[in-house]
Regions:
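Hydrophobic alpha-helical transmembrane segments
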Residues: 17-22, 93, 116-120
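Residue-level recognition of pore/gate-forming positions within transmembrane alpha-helices
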Residues: 25, 122-123
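Active-site His/Glu-centered metal-binding helix of metallohydrolases
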Residues: 93, 97, 128, 147
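Alpha-helical transmembrane segments of multipass membrane proteins
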Residues: 105, 124-132, 154
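Membrane-interface micro-motifs in multi-pass membrane enzymes
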Residues: 138-156
């Protein structure tokens, strides 16, 4: 008998990474299959822009919230929801690949709770500092701030 251990066909990915991954993919699937298919009809583009406008983090949002004292769920939720909305399908593909690759590496060294915490804190800090320091009128959306947090965690 041999002690040969077969490696799995697909490397196991931590559950916490899969939860984040499916959150990103579900939003994109809603946009693609709910509004006319993968070729990017006008309805898909309009709905994507509506999501960006309603759930992205605009510049000076945090400053405005502190000045007015308005911490309603509509504004606070933007800091948590924005990483699940991407500007294009290609952005989703790159974000998904980087998330799975870096998330697997980080998930091997940290617990699932720590991985979720790294993702959440990276996106929250990125949104907060963007909203108090941005000078242009671009709205912050996309999964990359959380992925950059995984880069930092992996190099740690």
């Amino acid at each position: 008998m041999s002690d040969y251990n077969r490696s799995p066909i697909v490397n196991p990915i931590p559950t916490s990474i899969l939860l984040i991954f499916f959150g990103i993919i579900l939003v994109e699937a809603f946009l693609i299959f709910g509004f006319g298919g993968p070729l990017g009809k006008t309805e898909t583009t309009i709905e994507r822009l509506t999501l960006v406008q309603n759930y992205g983090v605009p510049p000076n949002l945090a400053t405005w919230m502190f000045e007015t004292g308005n911490f309603s769920i509509d504004y606070v939720s933007r800091f948590i929801v924005y990483p699940f909305i991407n500007l294009s399908g290609l952005s989703v593909v790159f974000a998904a690949v980087l998330l799975l690759a870096l998330g697997k590496m980080v998930g091997e060294f940290f617990s699932s709770f720590s991985v979720i915490l790294i993702w959440l804190l990276s996106t929250l800090f990125a949104a907060f500092f963007y909203s108090i320091s941005a000078t242009d009128e671009q709205i912050l959306v996309g999964s990359f701030p959380g992925i950059y947090g995984f880069v930092g965690a992996y190099t740690f």
